[in-house]
Curated annotation (Swiss-Prot):
Alphabetized InterPro entries for the sequence: G3P_acylTferase_PlsY
Subunit structure of this chain's protein: Probably interacts with PlsX.
Chain's gene name: plsY
Purpose of the protein: Catalyzes the transfer of an acyl group from acyl-phosphate (acyl-PO(4)) to glycerol-3-phosphate (G3P) to form lysophosphatidic acid (LPA). This enzyme utilizes acyl-phosphate as fatty acyl donor, but not acyl-CoA or acyl-ACP.
Designated name of the protein: Glycerol-3-phosphate acyltransferase
Regions crossing the membrane: 2-22, 54-74, 80-100, 114-134, 153-173
Family as reported in the entry's similarity comment: Belongs to the PlsY family.
Originating organism: Pseudoalteromonas translucida (strain TAC 125)
Record's catalysed reaction(s): an acyl phosphate + sn-glycerol 3-phosphate = a 1-acyl-sn-glycero-3-phosphate + phosphate
């Protein structure tokens, strides 16, 4: 019963789209229909600059961290804790309050992994930066980092490997359009002057 309640609360919290709310606060275009059409920090940065993007990023991370920390302190078993993290990500991807049109949940997924340990967070961040430096593809860096997350978790806290694997599968599924563009050579690189506006090129 408690796990079910936390699952619902995590989904509802995840459904609060900070990208849309911050864009309205700063009188920016709706990120769902402008830029890359992705309501996330990257697109908000494209539409409005660093300050609103940072606010979106922080809130999206907290959407994952807060419910998982709550589940952790309520002593939910690892599988239930993982489902809470998945619920937060699902809320971000398919927000109840915004027509079920959400983002890709990379920041929210990262936030949901923070309670496992800062060492895991550090490994994921380092992996992302290394891959961006090598390939210049932000989406590929995110995919590699999230794909390695179960391995990192197994090395640090093995009991959470299965829940983290759930999140990995969810994030990869959400990035299927990016994967297709990577294979076709049409995925924009970091620092490109102009990304296609008719495709969801954000991570």
């Amino acid at each position: 019963m408690l796990a079910t309640l936390m699952f619902i609360l995590a989904y509802l919290l995840g459904s609060i789209s900070s990208a849309i709310l911050v864009s309205r606060l700063f009188k920016l275009p709706d990120p769902r229909s402008n830029g890359s059409n992705n309501p996330g920090a990257t697109n908000v940065y494209r539409l409005g600059g660093a300050l609103p993007a940072c606010l979106v990023l922080i809130f999206d991370v907290l959407k994952g961290t807060i419910p998982v920390w709550g589940a952790y302190f309520l002593d939910l078993e690892p599988l239930a804790l993982g489902l809470v993290a998945v619920a937060a990500c699902l809320g971000h991807m398919f927000p109840l309050f915004f027509g079920f049109k959400g983002g890709k949940a990379v920041a929210t997924a990262f936030g949901s992994l923070l309670p496992i340990g800062l060492s895991l967070a550090g490994l994921l961040i380092c992996t992302w930066f290394i891959m961006v430096a090598i390939t210049r593809y932000s989406s590929l860096a995110a995919l590699v980092a999230v794909s390695l997350a179960p391995l990192y978790t197994w090395l640090i806290k093995p009991l959470y490997t299965l829940p983290v694997t759930f999140i990995t599968v969810l994030i990869i599924f959400r990035h299927r359009s990016n994967i297709a563009r990577l294979f076709s050579g049409n995925e924009p690189k970091v620092g490109a002057k102009k990304a296609p506006t008719d495709e969801k090129s954000d991570i």
